[in-house]
Amino acid sequence: MNNAVTKIAKENLADLVTFAPRERFEPTDPIFKILPETQTVICLGFRVLRGIYRGTEEGTTYYQYTTMGVENMEETIMPMAQLRVAAFLEEKGFLALPQRRHQQIMAEPNSTNPEVAYDAVYRGKSAEVQLDFENTAVKCGLGGKGLSGAILTSDFGPFVRYCFILTTAKLKPTPLQTPYLCDGCQECVKACPGKAISKNGTRDPWQCAVYYNGANGTKNPFMPPDAFADLPDRTSIITGNKHLTPEQARKVLNEIYFYPPAQHAYQCSICGRACDTACYIHLEQNGLLKRKFKKPFRTREPWQFCADDFKTE
């Protein structure tokens, strides 16, 4: 059965397929609230093309990451693979329940999802039970958790998205991966254009949202010189040195009109997941990734603009 599931998933563009038995999860885990009869959690991992990140690296094209690396993955490619695998399992007489990220539904009352417009998020919806995606991925043997919280895989590093299927079928488990990729190098922390990741790996979702959307002018080719002219501390905002409260973050986000959003409320990533890119480069430089390329990802010093370009006086 494992081989058949893996074959169907890979025929539908999944790159990694792993399995976790129910015994790996605590009795209070959300999977048992969603489907109490769950016997196996299937994890489907999908590479985000390395080339998609090149646009931000070169400062030449940004829409490709958001549309091809996020929106189409989450809304088209990944659900199709889930549905095909789930249909196969149900044809065999087992229940199968796909689980994808709820990009616009949150249990937290005052958090946000940087990938979507903050005013499109429905907060405080605790009645909608959701998986802890990162911990579930680890328990499925997909990879290990990095300092920033990203799942790191030996094939693609952090350049991966993933989803799950809960099923009543008992399938052979994938061994847990011994964490070895993250060495605590802090490259993800240093790379964030808004200092949204602390040294211990805690991520501020509102700070992340502001700079994911491009509030750091030194890394945003679309920002006009008079951006945020009516906001206090605009220079600190533009250079990524201003720590923003959720209320302040909303005000900044209301003034970010640098680039059009995609469908389904997905915001264009101007930072291009700088944290993940820095992590990938570090893993590649240290020879820790299985998949090799003819040239290294980074071939020269990263570009940036001067903060003086945004002076209004």
Give each language-model segment a name.
Residues 1-83:
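Non-catalytic, usually N-terminal nucleic-acid engagement modules in DNA/RNA processing proteins
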Residues 23, 48, 171, 198, ...:
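Flexible, active-site-proximal loop/turn residues at the rims of small-molecule/cofactor binding pockets
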Residues 26-27, 199, 217, 286:
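Flexible loop/turn segments at secondary-structure boundaries
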Residues 36-37, 117-118, 220-221, 303-308:
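Short alpha-helix boundary/capping motifs
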Residues 53-54, 97, 288:
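Short, solvent-exposed secondary-structure capping/transition elements
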Residues 73-281, 291-299:
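Catalytic cores of enzyme domains
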Residues 286-313:
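C-terminal non-catalytic accessory extensions
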